[in-house]
Amino acid sequence: MHRKELLNLLARYRSRFMEEEAFVRRAIEFVNQHEKIFDRETPVHVTGSAWVVSPDREQVLLMHHRKLNQWFQPGGHADGDADILRVALRECAEETGLEPSHIRLIDSMIFDVDIHTTPPMGNTPLHEHIDIRFVVEIDDWLPIPGNDESHAVEWFPLYQVLRYNNNRSTYRMLEKTRGIRNFHRTIPTQERHAAKALW
């Protein structure tokens, strides 16, 4: 996936949330107008994250970010990698501490798009993330070791998630999760093999 492929994904994506539609339009404009969109050194850059659900779609996996002191889905910087789906899957594996084989891609299409400001930390100034999210599935019985970027990684029932992160983008993703609750099927086998090849 490169800039053109990301543009294709964004162009095909539709949201029923007005603020997210505005994010998508801005993301398309940004990707069209800039080249170094995957580098964290730029004041605005594209990031990737994974919204993790249990197989029954009744729980969401969140990590308590050590630096930001908030609960978020796994995700992070692309660091020059233009394949934003691969970035999301890689970050999910790193931040959960799980082997990639335990992370199953539900859909290779975009699940959510968000644009948000990240506060300055250390030598890193205030900057903006254009975060491209994909939905994945992990078995909720697996031990989740996490890594040093988080204080904890925990499963939460859908009805509890907003107690820990009540921002608008979390609300959107919860609503979308409720929409796929009865769809307990991951992507077809051939696509799953293609997803594994991303690693």
What positions do the PLM features span?
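Nudix hydrolase/Nudix homology domain
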Residues: 3-13, 127, 138-199
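Acidic, metal-coordinating catalytic segment for phosphate/diphosphate chemistry
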Residues: 12-49, 198
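Charged, low-complexity, helix/coiled-coil-prone segments
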Residues: 22-40, 75-81, 114-125
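N-terminal strand-loop-strand
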Residues: 31, 38-73
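Glycine-rich, flexible loop/turn motifs
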Residues: 33, 42, 74, 109, ...
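Conserved Nudix-box catalytic region and its N-terminal flanking loop in Nudix hydrolases
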Residues: 58-98, 199
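Unchanged
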Residues: 79-169
